[in-house]
Amino acid sequence: MQTIFFGSIGTLVETSEIQRKAFNTAFKEFGLNWYWNIGNYINMIQKPGGIQRIKEYSKSKLKDNEVKKIYDLKIKYFREYSVNAVKPREGDLEVINYANINNIKLGFITTTSKETIDIIKDSLSRYIDFNNFDLITYEKDCSKKKPNPDIYNFAINNLNVAKNNSITIEDTPVSYASSKKANIKTILFPGEYSVNKNNISSSYKIFEEVKNFFEINQI
C-alpha cells in the first residue's frame, strides 16, 4: 500500500506570521514585555514546539502553569486570526486529489497540539476534507519530537505500510530529518520562514514530485 505523508502544518498552510502575531498578543495580555520580531521568530520555529519555545525564551524563569496560560492565550488568538485568513499551499490539493484517485493512503504527521491541528482543520475546511486522511498525529503520539524519527515510525506501524512505498512532504530541515531518519523518501517543501542552512535539495512542485515518485514505483 502506498502512502503520502504531509508533515508539519507548514506543508499544508502558511501560518507562521499569524502564529507570531498570536504569540505577541498573548504576551501582551499576560503582562510580559516580550515581542518576537520576524528575525528571531524565524530562528525559533526551525524546530517544533510552542510551549518549549516559551520556556527557552524565558530562560526557565516562568513556572509551567504560567507557560501553559501563555500558550493557551496564543491558541485563542491563533484561532481568531486564522478565520478566513488561510488557504492550502500550492500543489497540496492536487496531491490530495491524486491520493484519493489512486487509493493512496494519506497521513498528516505532526507533533503539535490537538488544539492547533483543530484550528488548521477548521481554517482549511472550505478546501480540504480531513476525513480523507487515514492518520493525523499529535504530540501525544510520540515521546520525542522531530528531528527524532519516532513519529514517522509510529505512522508507518499504525497504517501498516511499507517505507519504500511512502513519501513525505516536510517544510523545514529539522522536520525533513525526522522522516529521512525513518528511511522514508522525503521532499523538502520550504515555508516562507524556513531556513535551509545545509542546502538540502528542495522543491515547490510537490505534485510533480509525488506523481513522479509513484510512477517510478509503478503504483
Description of each model-found segment:
Residues 113-114, 119-219:
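Asp-based, Mg2+/Mn2+-dependent phosphohydrolase catalytic module
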Residues 2-93, 98-102:
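N-terminal helical cap/lid subdomain that shapes the substrate entry/recognition surface
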Residues 23, 92-123, 179:
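Substrate-recognition element of Asp-dependent hydrolases with the DxDx(T/V) motif
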Residues 12, 106-109, 168-169:
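Conserved SAM-binding loop
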Residues 16-17, 48, 93, 111-114, ...:
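Alpha-helix N-cap/helix-start capping motif
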Residues 1, 103, 163-165:
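A general structural motif
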Residues 1-2, 101, 214-219:
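Short, Lys/Arg-enriched, disordered terminal segments
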